[in-house]
Amino acid sequence: MDMIDKLIAYEEGMLDGAGMVYLFAELVRNGMAWSLQGHYGRMASRLIDTGILTKDGDIDEMRAIEYGIEM
């Protein structure tokens, strides 16, 4: 699935929690989280603030599980 398909799936609510985390990890890594509409940057910031993602886009799966996201 290419990035556009992933974004459409996210917008349509078709991604589960893990899919959303993986999408935002990719958006942080490639910098798109900060150039798309504001929601994406805010969500990426929340995931970073909670420790689920690092500022480099790495995923802390144990932290995600603590927040109820099945990885």
Regions found by a protein language model. Name each.
Residues 1-71:
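Catalytic phosphate/metal-binding cores of nucleic-acid and nucleotide-processing enzymes, i.e., regions
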